């Protein structure tokens, strides 16, 4: 994790209308979520799916417990806890995602989680006897709604074809990375400045959270 990401996240937290003490607690929680992206993914999926709670109890380190209680979300770590409105929790999650989620290089091949995909898409993959592999060709693409989709991609190994529409891929749908594309310092700097800082300054978040925030309003 880079200092620029931590600095940006602190700025993001300052936009959250909670007490200073709650903000410090949420910062501590975010260090676990950013260091364990699968925990963050499973937690937010549990929230989206209407589950009652999500628990992360590692062998080493402090446990985290999330309780989804109607219009509120209770976050507990050891003996400390904070209660957020649903809207504030969604806003918090969008900042964790914006600042800390890995942005995979162009050309990366990822496997999608079939259990999270629409049935018609699953059927399309299975009819061609294909693995659920997608090659990523676009990142954090801003849509007409003003939010961004994490990736645009095409089925692997076919790639771009004139008779095939691109796939919109959320971070939540990615089960694993099969092969990473090329990256260097220029690419990393671009991701930090364009996809993180500029989006933060413009108030652009992932469509996963943008739609939720609209629904909350």
Range-by-range predicted roles:
Residues 1-69:
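N-terminal intrinsically disordered, low-complexity, charge/repeat-rich segments that act as generic
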Residues 118-124:
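Short boundary/loop segments of OB/S1/cold-shock single-stranded nucleic-acid-binding domains
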Residues 111-115, 135-138, 203-212:
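Amphipathic, soluble alpha/beta structural segments
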Residues 48, 56-73, 124-181:
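Basic/aromatic-rich interaction segments and small domains that mediate binding to polyanionic partners
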Residues 86-96, 148-217:
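Intrinsically disordered, low-complexity, charged/polar segments
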Residues 67-76, 80-83, 217:
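Charge-rich, low-complexity terminal tails
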